Amino acid sequence: MEQVNELKEKGNKALSVGNIDDALQCYSEAIKLDPHNHVLYSNRSAAYAKKGDYQKAYEDGCKTVDLKPDWGKGYSRKAAALEFLNRFEEAKRTYEEGLKHEANNPQLKEGLQNMEARLAERKFMNPFNMPNLYQKLESDPRTRTLLSDPTYRELIEQLRNKPSDLGTKLQDPRIMTTLSVLLGVDLGSMDEEEEIATPPPPPPPKKETKPEPMEEDLPENKKQALKEKELGNDAYKKKDFDTALKHYDKAKELDPTNMTYITNQAAVYFEKGDYNKCRELCEKAIEVGRENREDYRQIAKAYARIGNSYFKEEKYKDAIHFYNKSLAEHRTPDVLKKCQQAEKILKEQERLAYINPDLALEEKNKGNECFQKGDYPQAMKHYTEAIKRNPKDAKLYSNRAACYTKLLEFQLALKDCEECIQLEPTFIKGYTRKAAALEAMKDYTKAMDVYQKALDLDSSCKEAADGYQRCMMAQYNRHDSPEDVKRRAMADPEVQQIMSDPAMRLILEQMQKDPQALSEHLKNPVIAQKIQKLMDVGLIAIR
């Protein structure tokens, strides 16, 4: 067992300094020696979570609970992994199960509160996603009349699929009316009352819940430390950093087991721009926090501050590393947003650093050789690498589109042709290859349009002229069955989107029952464009 303890301590030390792989190796070796040690599985679960391997973190959390069902930490590990996996309902149940064994465990209590809040928020955030949405709107006279307007239905579907757009749509009185119906409250009257209403009863008790009364139970040194901290906070707010440091240092001397005073000092050095000192103090604070079993939220704050210091220095890779460590301890929206911001910047930096026109030319030539030999998959790989090296070269997209066409991946070919044309609108090959892909898909009307654009650029282009003639003859001679027309049309993503739109389906039903309704719908340019698309592919015909 001595060897197991040594490996565990070695793993703990590696984890505390961020050497996650070393920590995992130590814990795994210790588990081989002592496979029934619940603490080892708990520690390895934490390591996997910090690495971002949440499935394995979950598995180790489950094993911890199996081995020690009355230990609250095991449930915390399991629930945290479930939270990272976005399995919030299961995480909530896990926290509840843990509290049955340790009713006063603050970590489990806080975790349960977070889960309940997130689940409630998730349900409220998208009231447009209820299964009986249209029945509810149809049953209320305030929204029944709105349903006859296709633009209203489009708006509802947009919010149904993307609730984050709600904030930008609240100026639309139709949306406020809809929310009133869906939520069962009169939002209009609420707006008027809020201007004169006094604060609701619940907030005052929250204001009264201050830490000061608890000081009666604290030892004298901790009371004095808290007073010094408050003096330091006052000085910090006034940007009197030297005075703030003195008070925080005094608080630390009075209560050396409280990591908060050290992280407060780190905050001062962060504001002063001394990021190395800030990080040094945060690492020290984490060490003190671990030794004294500090709340994970405090550990997370220290890691986040280290991440912020690297972000300020534009060392985004290091910033991401410590943001992830913070999120593994305690997940907060602010840190998650900052981490995503750093990841976005780093990804763009790496993309720009990867650009090299000379290497792009080498890859292009290799792709051309493979294309000539008929090895289209390999040619596509070389062209893809060339595009990464020089994403502004239109000819590379054109070449890859030719590969996709040979491989019968016509939608991908069209996408590359669009990119090619956007980068170089006068490049004939972009148009002829796009038209060739459309011709292969038997979309002759569109293909002729694109061949015509190529001829507008160069009237002597034989490839475009021949293609136009072929499509014209094919269109004249085609005798497709209705099934063939439908199958070909439904292969078009744009048609799929139109036909899956409930508003458009309603309009098409109305057109079948009442042909006169068409003239009203065609007044809406968006609807008219969609109907024209369905006519072009042969799905509908207007007599």
Curated annotation (Swiss-Prot):
Q: Show the domain comment.
A: The TPR 1 repeat interacts with the C-terminal of HSC70. The TPR 4, 5 and 6 repeats (also called TPR2A domain) and TPR 7, 8 and 9 repeats (also called TPR2B domain) interact with HSP90.
One MF term in the entry's GO annotations: Hsp90 protein binding
Q: What are the leading ranks of the lineage?
A: Eukaryota, Metazoa, Chordata, Craniata, Vertebrata
Phosphothreonine found at:
T198, T332
Ranges of residues in domain STI1: 130-169, 492-531
Query: Where does this chain carry the motif Bipartite nuclear localization signal?
Result: 222-239
Q: Where in the cell is it found?
A: Cytoplasm; Nucleus; Dynein axonemal particle
Q: Does the keyword Glycoprotein apply?
A: no
Task: Mark the residues carrying the PTM Phosphoserine.
Answer: S16, S481
Residue(s) carrying N6-acetyllysine: K8, K301, K312, K325, K344, K446
Q: Which terms does the UniProt entry file under GO BP? A: cellular response to interleukin-7
Q: Subunit info?
A: Probably forms a complex composed of chaperones HSP90 and HSP70, co-chaperones STIP1/HOP, CDC37, PPP5C, PTGES3/p23, TSC1 and client protein TSC2. Forms a complex with HSPA8/HSC70, HSPCA/HSP-86 and HSPCB/HSP-84. Interacts with PACRG. Interacts with EEF1AKMT3. Interacts with HSP90/HSP90AA1; the interaction dissociates the PPP5C:HSP90AA1 interaction. Interacts with FLCN, FNIP1 and FNIP2. Interacts with HSPA8/HSC70. Interacts with HSP90AB1; upon SMYD2-dependent HSP90AB1 methylation.
Query: According to its UniProt entry, what is the function of this protein?
Result: Acts as a co-chaperone for HSP90AA1. Mediates the association of the molecular chaperones HSPA8/HSC70 and HSP90.
Keyword list, A-Z? Acetylation, Cytoplasm, Isopeptide bond, Nucleus, Phosphoprotein, Repeat, TPR repeat, Ubl conjugation
Ranges in coiled-coil conformation: none
Cross-link Glycyl lysine isopeptide (Lys-Gly) (interchain with G-Cter in SUMO2) mapped to chain:
K123, K210
Its cellular-component GO annotations read: cytosol; dynein axonemal particle; Golgi apparatus; nucleus; protein folding chaperone complex; protein-containing complex
Which residues in this protein are found as N-acetylmethionine?
M1
TPR repeats span: 4-37, 38-71, 72-105, 225-258, 259-292, 300-333, 360-393, 394-427, 428-461
| Keyword Ubl conjugation belongs to the record | yes
Question: What gene is it encoded by?
Answer: STIP1
The species is Homo sapiens
Q: Which PANTHER family match?
A: STRESS-INDUCED-PHOSPHOPROTEIN 1 (PTHR22904:SF523), TPR REPEAT CONTAINING PROTEIN (PTHR22904)
List cystine links.
Answer: none
Residue ranges of the region described as Disordered: 192-233
Protein's name in the database: Stress-induced-phosphoprotein 1
